Each structure stands twice: as C-alpha cells, then as structure tokens.
Amino acid sequence: MKKFIVTVVAFLSIIIIAPITEFKPFIHLQNEVRQYIDIHINKETISAENKLDTPKKQQFAFNNIQMNMSKSDVEKTLNKPKRVTFNEYGTKWYTYYDGDYNNFIMVSYIKDKVNALYTNQNIITSKSKIKYNTPKSVVRQRLGEPETEIVKGRVRYEQNNKEYDVFHKNHIYTTVFYDKHRRNNVTAVLQVSDAMENRLKEQYGAPSKSLADSFELQNFDLVNAERKQHQLSTLKYSKQNSETARKHSKDMAKNHYFDHTNLKGQSPFDRLKKDGITFNSAGENLAYGQVSSIYAHQGLMNSIGHRKNILNDTFKILGVGVDFNDEKQP
C-alpha cells in the first residue's frame, strides 16, 4: 500500500502493499487463529497488568503518563523508548509501546520533563472522565468551548477544523481528535505545553533531512498503532517501498503538484513496477497541508478511502517518503 502524506511542511508518501504469495489455506487459517489468540491475550494483559488510573495532578493521562512528569518516572513505568525521532518543535518524540504496538504513546521532553504527549489508543484517562470513544458533544460539555485561534508572533492561526478541538488551560494545549466515521467520538489526544508550543515560531517546523526522516518513521508507527487499536496485524517497514514513495514526494514538492499520477502519467502501480516491486494489491494515500505526522495521520483516518487503505487487512508492507516544498510544506 502506498501512502503519500504531504504536509504543508513536507510531502509525505506512504506505500502499503500485499506482496505476491502462493495461496496456502492452512497457513492462512493458522494465522487467523494466532491473531484471534493474540487479540484476546492482549486484552487480558492490558486489563491485568496496565491498570489505568484517573490522573490526580493533570487533566489527562495516557497509560498513566502525565504532563510534567520526569523522564525517569516515565521510564520507570514504560521502560526505554522503542524509537526516538525529531519533531517540528525542535525537540524529540520518544515512542513507547509494549510488544507489538500495544499501549502506544509518544512523549516529548524539555529539561527531562514531559512537555508533550500523544496517543491514538484506548489508554486515555482524565479527571473529567473523557476517554477513547467519548462523544464530541460530551468533550465540549466537560472541557468548555474550544480555542478559535492560536497566535504566533503577529500572526493568528484559526482553529476551525471540525475533525478536532483545541483546548487551552493551565498552560497546556489539548487537541482532541474525533473519528467522523464513528459518530465523532474521541480517537486520539495530543497535549503540548505552552513552553513546547512557543518553540515553534511559525506554523511549520524548519525543514531538514532529519525531520523528513523522522516524519517517515513516525507515520509508520502511527499506522501500526492504529491497526493494533483496530485489532489488525501490524505492517513491516520496506526501504524499497519507501524509496519509491520518497521519489514521488520529491517530485511533487519540486514540481508543485499533488496527485497520485505523476507528470509522466505514471500511476502509483506503474511506479512500483518500474522500481521492481511485485505485489498482489497496493494502495496509496496522499495528504497535504498538515503541520506534523500526527495531524497528517489523523486527517487520513477521517478520509474514507485513505482510512480503508490504513485498515486494509490484506496489506503486509509499508513504505513512507517525505519531502518539503519551497514554502516549508511537507
């Protein structure tokens, strides 16, 4: 499956495919049984070992991790991160999860204190009883009216996207993302401190190869965390597919277009075949105008065609490619 995520900071291209395989009904049955067992074991493990407590100090907690916690306390609970990548704030995302993307959470620190948090899984607790799948109307009843703008320097950025709400309280921006295909219920939450948000002087982060590489890996993790939440098998990362996706992102950024078909008339499938990649089926997602990998992913999940690609149970391999245009847009 090819996924293209192009943000106003970068062009992001993601490819997800189902490789050519022989039909093996017995192996297929075995895999289905294993997946069924894994799902139910995971559910039991989460309830038995990961008791989610209502936070006492902060409004929200994700897998019992709260804003302003020390890095040492976080890692006493979550152990060491599975991945560390750069973000648009000029700091790093530390990505934690158990096993195969269970209890997925992203944490960013300033001076070894939690200043940003994100999850797209059912590990959200809050003082106001907001959690995964809480209706949008209930969120607004309990958190109040969302922000209508964010000011950076002399520029005001309107916040009027119906797919998420931004709340600002106690020096923390809380962005609640909604799943419009599931009755506008909570599907993810991002928290960013004032100190972290103020590090981003403009709407988008400064383009760099390290940021592009980081956006690619973050999107790979976000897709797998989403699939795990929906009880689907996770995908394997493909350098070859990523290179195909990356070339298309670079082409779109350089030549100022945004389309599945490039200027030579080649479709995603043509480009895969040209690069020697064989597949039974493939899909491509494109996104543009998002400020980060998180916003790009959440936007794709609310687009029905892109959502079907992300949650396609036949896809096995994922490739991601990111590039930035002249206006700092991914």
Feature names for model-found ranges:
Residues 1-4:
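Positively charged n-region of N-terminal signal peptides that target proteins for export
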Residues 6-21:
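Hydrophobic membrane-insertion alpha-helices, especially the h-region
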Residues 25-111, 138-186, 191, 313-328:
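A cross-family detector of function-defining hotspots
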Residues 58-64, 122-130, 204-214, 228-238, ...:
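Second-shell loop/turn segments in exported
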Residues 72, 76, 137, 141, ...:
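Solvent-exposed, polar/charged alpha-helical surfaces in well-ordered, non-transmembrane soluble domains
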Residues 118-171, 268-330:
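A well-ordered secondary-structure block
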Residues 170-237:
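Intrinsically disordered, low-complexity
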Residues 211-270, 314-318:
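Short, well-ordered surface patches within globular domains
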